[in-house]
Amino acid sequence: MELTKYNHATVVLEQDGATLVIDPGTFTPEGADLATAAVAVLVTHEHFDHFDVDAVRAALDANDALVVRGPAAIVDQLGAHDGRVAAVSAGDAFEVGPFSVQVFGEEHAVIHGDIPTIANVGYLVNGAVFHPGDAYLVPGVPVRTLLLPTSGPWTSTAEAVDYVRAVSPEHAVQIHEAMLSELGQQSAARFLGPDGLGPVPVQILPAGESITV
């Protein structure tokens, strides 16, 4: 399976010629095109940097085979589209094209006590790649590649260290890094990796670049 990183939290997985898009947010200008070409779009939660409602709606209109999965708030904003848009929650599992997906988690990490928490789910794809959305979700199953959030109003370096240790992946890739400069990304990778307090390498993957996972 091939993983291509796009801006911030958006990733595309490719297997056997089919693609799956996770979190096409407004920081990803090519999100509508990526979603239109995919067999499925997975959304972790409703925040704009993870879910560009206009882009996903346009993709649904352009590709009548596209399916979208996410928390109930995603269905509320998009509509059901004859069942192609459906809500998922922790414990769900489904297959779409060559992708097997398991769903974990319930809530977005706390940003501040004055801000209500919302639903957030994480996705494990083909038993290999885990996208936690905006939470330090520990799936409790083996993970080959962890997509590791490294910046944002809810993140904590101390919690991130403990998170990587708890998940214990073979490899990690930085996501949710739009608030960091290049130097900040390098610092996060070093601190969260084996040269710092983390157990595994944390890769910086520039937007548009791909790796095999």
Regions picked out by a protein language model, each given a short descriptive name:
Residues M1-T36, A87-P142, W154-E159, L205-V213:
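Core dinuclear metal-dependent hydrolase active-site scaffold
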Residues T4, G79-A93, G97, V161, ...:
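Binuclear metal-ion centers of metallo-dependent hydrolases, dominated by the metallo-beta-lactamase
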Residues F27-G70, R144-L147:
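Active-site metal-binding motif and surrounding structural segment of the metallo-beta-lactamase
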Residues L42, R69, A86, Q102, ...:
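Hydrophobic/aromatic beta-strand patches that form the interior of the parallel beta-sheet core
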Residues H47-F48, A73-V75, D92, L137, ...:
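Alpha-helix capping/helix-boundary segments
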Residues A62-L66, V167-H171, G198-V200:
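A short helix->loop->beta-strand "cap" motif at the edges of active sites that frequently abuts
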Residues D64-A73, H171-A178:
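Short internal beta-strands
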Residues V121-Q185, A189, P194:
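Metallo-beta-lactamase
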